[in-house]
């Protein structure tokens, strides 16, 4: 269990994070007696699932010195298994025995450790496979071979550099995911470079979630292209963009930097056509395949000489 964040709330009677945690805890409770339940020690909601978890408990944590703090310390004292990020390595503990599995910098999907969410994924994957007896050399080789490329993981941190522009395609469709992506963007952006973002969220999320996406986007991007999916999931056309724009503008972001477009193709093209060397474009697609093809066409053609940004009256 990686974490519990505020997504899908307001759907099917799940109104709070505590409600969602109770639903997710069914997975932990259903683990067979001889199985292993892998939990994130850094997330309070996930940590609380340990009380009712089935099978043998396995912890993972990205905190420094996690092996010497609770709940991992007492777990290891009783001979348990834990995987932690320690001294730049993925470290596996079995009781007091420590094994360095792989350097985090050697895991391509973490981008040298900059993509902290993929560090968490690597820790969780190591915990799960090590608990099942997979040799650490095999785990290290697998983590070293798996990338965040479109071929390995479509729509999950796919990166392409073209014409001096870095393009990132990632399905960050909720506030927690956008927050994590924003941390990475802050680390990768070049001095003096702009960051363009194509941003959206499914229409069946709460109004407050849509507004929060706009607030978060304003703190990450210099130019925002809000767009809507073909299926509004019960919302009228334009209403999703309106709420996200409301959030962005509430932060004091200039209205000239907030754009509302009808679809993701137009939003993608607007970002790519106006980016210049040193800029970054972050695309959050619904049609992952179609948008990736569009990005590749951008890479294969000469950059357009466009000076103005699109008008706001797109939808």
Regions found by a protein language model. Give the residues of each.
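Flexible active-site lid/hinge loop adjacent to a nucleotide/diphosphate
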Residues: 1-68
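Fold-independent oxyanion-binding glycine-rich loops
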Residues: 3-5, 40-42, 49, 60-63, ...
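ATP-dependent carboxylate-amine ligase
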Residues: 13, 112-115, 127-137, 141-315
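Residue-level detector of flexible, active-site-proximal loop/helix-junction positions
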Residues: 45, 64-66, 97, 164, ...
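Acidic-glycine-rich active-site phosphate/pyrophosphate-binding loop
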Residues: 80-107, 156
């Amino acid at each position: 269990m990686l974490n519990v964040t505020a997504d899908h709330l307001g759907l099917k009677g799940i109104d709070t994070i505590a409600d969602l945690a109770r639903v997710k805890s069914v997975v932990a409770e259903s683990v067979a007696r001889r199985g292993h339940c892998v939990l994130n020690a850094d997330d309070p909601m996930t940590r609380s699932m340990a009380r009712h978890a089935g099978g043998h408990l396995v912890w993972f944590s990205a905190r420094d010195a996690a092996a010497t703090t609770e709940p991992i310390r007492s777990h290891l004292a009783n001979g348990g298994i834990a995987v932690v990020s320690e001294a730049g390595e993925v470290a596996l503990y079995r009781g007091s025995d420590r094994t360095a599995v792989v350097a985090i910098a050697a895991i391509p999907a973490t981008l040298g450790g900059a993509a902290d969410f993929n560090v968490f994924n690597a820790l969780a994957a190591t915990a799960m496979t090590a608990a099942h007896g997979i040799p650490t050399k095999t785990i290290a080789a697998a983590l070293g071979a798996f990338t965040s490329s479109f071929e390995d993981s479509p729509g999950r941190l796919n990166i392409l550099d073209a014409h001096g522009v870095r393009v990132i395609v990632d399905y960050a469709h909720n506030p927690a995911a956008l927050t994590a992506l924003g941390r990475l963007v802050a680390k990768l952006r070049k001095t003096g470079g702009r960051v363009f973002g194509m941003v959206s969220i499914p229409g069946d999320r709460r109004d407050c979630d849509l507004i929060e996406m706009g607030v978060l986007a304003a703190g990450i991007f210099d130019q925002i292209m809000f767009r809507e999916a073909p299926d509004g999931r019960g919302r009228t056309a334009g209403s999703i963009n309106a709420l996200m724009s409301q959030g962005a503008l509430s932060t004091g972001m200039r209205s000239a930097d907030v754009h509302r477009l009808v679809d993701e193709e137009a939003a993608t093209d607007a970002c790519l056509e106006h980016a210049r060397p040193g800029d970054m474009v972050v695309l959050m697609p619904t049609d992952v395949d179609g948008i990736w093809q569009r990005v590749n066409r951008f890479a294969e053609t000469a950059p357009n000489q466009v000076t103005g940004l699109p008008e706001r009256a797109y939808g």
